[in-house]
């Protein structure tokens, strides 16, 4: 496993112990600190992990050969149709079926889609591997 991460050694230790099923109280005793401190370390580690995931998604989106803009008023069905058509033009096989695509898009853009209709613009990218990246920063 790579040593270079965005996690401190203390965060790694706490996450490893939590993964083994240790309670925060037990970790605190072992590390000679408070349970509140263990909780704060774990919370900050999870924030760092989420930021890392967001960074990777951003880079994947930048490199996506297929990007479609989902505009206010577009329906989920229209978006999926355009997404699949544009992917086919690029020779990319999307790794999800239409039902799963609808679920993924609604899950990632839940506050921008109401009753299968886009309420505020966002973009979707498709990687060369057919992975879907929803970019809410547009």
UniProtKB/Swiss-Prot annotation:
Signal peptide: none
InterPro entries attached to this UniProt entry: RNA_pol_sigma70_r4, Tfx_C, Tfx_DNA-bd_arc, Tfx_DNA-bd_euryarc, Tfx_DNA-bd_sf_arc
Molecular function terms, GO-annotated: DNA binding; DNA-binding transcription factor activity
Highest taxon, organism lineage: Archaea
Listed Gene3D superfamilies: DNA-binding protein Tfx superfamily, archaea
A Gene Ontology BP annotation from the UniProt entry: DNA-templated transcription initiation
Keywords annotated in UniProt: Activator, DNA-binding, Transcription, Transcription regulation
UniProt function note: Transcriptional activator of the fmdECB operon.
Family from the record: Belongs to the Tfx family.
Name of the protein in question: DNA-binding protein Tfx
